[in-house]
């Protein structure tokens, strides 16, 4: 009898100890200052914004200002590239595509116009060497009076756009590479780009409010619209090693490949002002590395106010989501938000 009582007491003690540990762990996450900072930044964020923080399988902080919620759909501009790069890597995972494949393997017209050496990797890292408009000017590039399909647009890129440098050598942040890779995927799979994105990325990730603007020609570099909740599902998948709700979307190897720097500062010729000094990986920018040079923090800011960030060392993701350009222009404010989050999520990150 005494032994049973002792055993029961020990079990209860373990349970209580676990619950106390759990409560203490959660009590350490006090985001009061973060919420106050968001409120104080209302004007700087254009009056409307959402901030979400995700860690350990759940959203641990959520706050909205103005008439804007985590479900509100808004343009995400260049944050679209992260989605497109992930879609590309899903085909690499299956062995249907290699990052070292030449674009001309799928689009022979590129060889005809001396662009046959451009690779898939060059396309998703802005290293094609082809002249092109900036991300924000895609609408002019896809003028419906001029192009009626992605096929026509990409053929025009191959035949009329000038090669300014050899592929793989100079970084120019524009729409060209992502436009080309979207057409490569269409040829490879005999499906429309948006259909493939839905089948492999947005639908499995329950991104129900994520789609593309109905331009005559789809914009795989900056034409998506999404919501804070939706995009956080995407970030959580990457943070969790490619798995979402128990289903594998990407391999861990694919995610690691996407995080590797593809540029050095000496290679960068054209880049957004807010990202000067940053190196590009694939679909994302490198915002932090460890003492060995391994990428630890990545982000993919969009012109229209989306700031998605993953800190792999501290194992959290956060997003600032707005319907306007104010947030995208304020990198110092975004850095201050991250600093306040880091203060609560302590880790030995160097």
Each language-model region and where it sits:
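Active-site-proximal loop and beta-strand segments within enzyme catalytic domains
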Residues: 39, 43-47, 67-173, 191
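Secretory-pathway/luminal and periplasmic proteins that interact with or process carbohydrate-rich
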Residues: 60-61, 111-118, 129-136, 194, ...
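Bacterial Sec-dependent N-terminal signal peptides
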Residues: 1-29
């Amino acid at each position: 009898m005494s032994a049973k009582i002792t055993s029961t007491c020990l079990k209860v003690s373990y349970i209580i100890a676990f619950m106390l540990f759990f409560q203490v762990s959660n009590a350490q996450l006090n985001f009061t200052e973060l919420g106050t900072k968001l409120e104080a930044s209302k004007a700087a964020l254009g009056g409307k914004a959402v901030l979400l923080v995700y860690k350990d399988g759940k959203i641990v902080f959520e706050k909205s200002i103005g008439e804007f919620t985590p479900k509100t759909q808004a343009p995400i501009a260049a944050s679209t590239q992260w989605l497109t790069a992930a879609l590309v890597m899903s085909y690499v995972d299956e062995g249907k595509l290699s990052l070292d494949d030449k674009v001309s393997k799928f689009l022979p017209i590129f060889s005809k116009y001396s662009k046959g050496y451009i690779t898939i990797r060059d396309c998703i890292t802005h290293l094609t060497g082809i002249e092109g408009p900036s991300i924000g000017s895609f609408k002019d590039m896809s003028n419906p009076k001029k192009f009626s399909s992605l096929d026509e647009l990409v053929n025009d890129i191959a035949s009329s756009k000038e090669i300014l440098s050899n592929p793989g050598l100079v970084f120019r942040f524009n729409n060209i590479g992502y436009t080309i890779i979207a057409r490569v995927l269409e040829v490879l799979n005999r499906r429309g780009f948006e259909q493939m994105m839905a089948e492999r990325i947005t639908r499995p990730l329950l991104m129900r409010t994520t789609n593309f603007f109905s331009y005559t020609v789809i914009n795989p570099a900056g034409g998506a619209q999404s919501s804070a909740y939706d995009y956080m599902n995407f970030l959580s998948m990457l943070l969790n090693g490619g798995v979402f709700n128990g289903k594998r979307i990407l391999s861990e190897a694919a995610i690691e490949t996407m995080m590797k720097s593809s540029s050095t500062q000496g290679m960068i010729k054209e880049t957004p002002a807010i990202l000067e000094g940053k190196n590009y990986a694939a679909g994302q920018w490198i915002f932090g590395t460890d003492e060995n040079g391994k990428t630890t923090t990545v982000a993919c800011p969009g012109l229209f106010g989306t700031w998605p960030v993953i800190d792999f060392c501290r194992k959290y993701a956060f997003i600032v989501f707005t319907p306007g350009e104010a947030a995208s222009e304020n990198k110092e404010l975004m850095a201050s938000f991250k600093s306040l989050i880091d203060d609560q999520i302590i880790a030995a990150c160097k």
